[in-house]
Amino acid sequence: MMTHVRIATRQSPLALWQARHVGALLTSRHPGLEVTLVEMTTEGDRFLSAPLSAVGGKGLFVKEIEQALLDGRADIAVHSLKDMTSVFPEGLILAAVPEREDPRDVFCGLGGLTLDTLPQGARVGTSSLRRSCILRSRRPDVDIVSVRGNVQTRLARTREQGLAGALLAYAGLKRLGLEDVITQVLPPEVSLPAVGQGVLAIQCRTDDARVRALLVPLEHATTRIAVTAERALLAKLEGGCTVPLAGYATVSGDTVFLRGLVGRPDGTHVVRGEVRGPVSQAHALGESLADDLLSRGAADILRDFARRFEARES
């Protein structure tokens, strides 16, 4: 039996909280196990001056950490699942997903502002194409300002730049004990969450049977079903670059209900859809919803977005 596990993690306060949380889950189920953190800085942490979509997308937060696993410098990696692309490097596996935290988006408005009370032409901070798309589809007058960094940095920059507020994930604020800054919780009907939002991803080497055995008690079956559907949707729509899409699944009994969205960043064209089916077909349901969205206009949106991305890169 293993007596020592090394967990690779980013150095942000939220990432460290998540890694320590997984460490605590492990030691509670395996008394005597020693856990140490391998703290790392990723490209996503270093390049904060440009929107994430302009510097390589969400995968920038995981590449160095995944390499540490492959090199044997760590045994486990803990990520936010929403930061992960649909395809993992060969040799790595999503070994466990603990129970999902609240997946909803929230608005943190200065002076108690909510999306309903934002003045005309208000400036709102977010680094997410998805959140920008959804907000602009509801409020075309709003001016989106790119605000990147860890949670505390984004909140500070929102205040420093005199923005009306910022859109963030409930889960991160809750984990950091910062719920008092929330002025409005946005239901999925208003702001459909990102694929994997609120879910911790525990990754390890595919051939590391001892680590995989340690992680079995941390797996939450219902969360796995939901993210299987969501990530199947993502895999069909991702297209190799960061795109404005959302996907959120819930499980009730033997049924999974998946909602999806693809839109232009400016919110002028948004395609929404949903599908229900048996949990045993979670992956197929994700692919089916992706096909439905593509047939109703998402393909055009994604092609246009890819062309713009390629033009910017050339």
Swiss-Prot record:
InterPro entries: HemC, Porphobilin_deaminase_cofac_BS, Porphobilin_deaminase_N, Porphobilinogen_deaminase_C, Porphobilinogen_deaminase_C_sf. CDD domains: PBP2_EcHMBS_like. Signal peptide: none annotated. The modification S-(dipyrrolylmethanemethyl)cysteine is found at residue 241. Binds 1 dipyrromethane group covalently. GO terms for molecular function: hydroxymethylbilane synthase activity. Pfam families: Porphobil_deam (PF01379), Porphobil_deamC (PF03900). One of its GO terms (cellular component) is cytoplasm. Disulfide bonds: none annotated. Pathway: Porphyrin-containing compound metabolism; protoporphyrin-IX biosynthesis; coproporphyrinogen-III from 5-aminolevulinate: step 2/4. Keywords: Porphyrin biosynthesis, Transferase. It catalyses: 4 porphobilinogen + H2O = hydroxymethylbilane + 4 NH4(+). Its EC number is 2.5.1.61. GO terms for biological process: protoporphyrinogen IX biosynthetic process. Its cofactor is dipyrromethane. NCBIfam families: hemC (TIGR00212). Monomer. The porphobilinogen subunits are added to the dipyrromethane group. Belongs to the HMBS family. Tetrapolymerization of the monopyrrole PBG into the hydroxymethylbilane pre-uroporphyrinogen in several discrete steps. This is Porphobilinogen deaminase. It comes from Myxococcus xanthus (strain DK1622). The gene is hemC.
